[in-house]
Amino acid sequence: MPWIQLKLNTTGANAEDLSDALMEAGAVSITFQDTHDTPVFEPLPGETRLWGDTDVIGLFDAETDMNDVVAILENHPMLGAGFAHKIEQLEDKDWEREWMDNFHPMRFGERLWICPSWRDVPDENAVNVMLDPGLAFGTGTHPTTSLCLQWLDSLDLTGKTVIDFGCGSGILAIAALKLGAAKAIGIDIDPQAIQASRDNAERNGVSDRLELYLPKDQPEEMKADVVVANILAGPLRELAPLISVLPVSGGLLGLSGILASQAESVCEAYADSFALDPVVEKEEWCRITGRKN
């Protein structure tokens, strides 16, 4: 069905209040967008980080009388009569089909493909991981996930144990198992991530070789030949003492979720325990790898 959207521009501090006003005026959903496309990379836990200059967009049913909506909003103390806004009619589309059409099989390195379930695999003889795009967890489209998948593809994982620290969808652990690892361990603070990893492992036929833990449940003694952590620079620095003990002597470490501008500080946190390789960059993100001393 067609929709009508009304867009307001405000400051991040006022965005929540105007969101409430739009909902009270009849909006069925609200979206916040940065006016200048400035990314937010690391909000604090529990924090909704908004931009200094924010567009608040309300979506309304096509039958809505927008004159009535504007009249209601004009009574809001932050807006007033003649407030600046933009109203647009959105064309009717099969949004689900359009969303699905945007996702195609993706190749990482020489052997590995990530394929959504509604697409045919490009190469039956390749290493194929079947994974559908979700709302919260990695599917390979982000540069940091791509960097980690390319790194795993470059390794000989035959018979190895791999730890995926901050496993999310389980994409890295599952890819490692499909690439020949004997066992993978996924750790995440989010129970939904643990469930997503379990479901994706079952879909790919590797659930019998994947162990999944919340941090409070993980074994005290865990070691692996390869450890990969695609989280964020802040946690990677703070958790360096914990992550650094996970690889066996001579084991490999791969870190991502790091902006190129943050690479130096993350390297410093691991330099005493690892012989680090040159940093690899993709867009504004990077990957740090090394071998345990």
Curated annotation (Swiss-Prot):
Residues binding S-adenosyl-L-methionine: T145, G166, D188, N230
Leader sequence segment: none
Compartmental location: Cytoplasm
EC number(s) recorded for this UniProt protein: 2.1.1.-
Entry-linked Pfam families: PrmA (PF06325)
Keyword Cytoplasm belongs to the record: yes
Entry keywords, A to Z: Cytoplasm, Methyltransferase, S-adenosyl-L-methionine, Transferase
Domain of life: Bacteria
GO MF annotation terms: protein-lysine N-methyltransferase activity
GO CC annotation terms, alphabetical: cytosol
Family annotation (CDD domains): AdoMet_MTases
Family listed: Belongs to the methyltransferase superfamily. PrmA family.
Annotated protein name in UniProt: Ribosomal protein L11 methyltransferase
Organism of derivation: Escherichia coli O81 (strain ED1a)
